[in-house]
Amino acid sequence: MRIQVKIIGPLMYAAGFSDKEVEVPPGTTVEGLVLSIGVPADRPRIVTRNGAAAAPGESLAEGDKVAVSPIYSGG
């Protein structure tokens, strides 16, 4: 299945891209996608799927739009 992935901030250096369509097998979860594109497992992040917060175990569907962003702090 094809998933559109947008990486925000310094995580794009780990993934090697900032915006790209990726091919994943059916049944891939949010966490499986994030790890497969090279984002380190120990890196805090926020993931959205089609504009809403996504749980790590949530299954993806053809055409989903996923955004991965580091967690920012400060003011």
Where are these regions (language model features)?
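Ubiquitin-like/PB1-type beta-grasp interaction modules and other compact soluble beta-rich domains
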Residues: 1-74
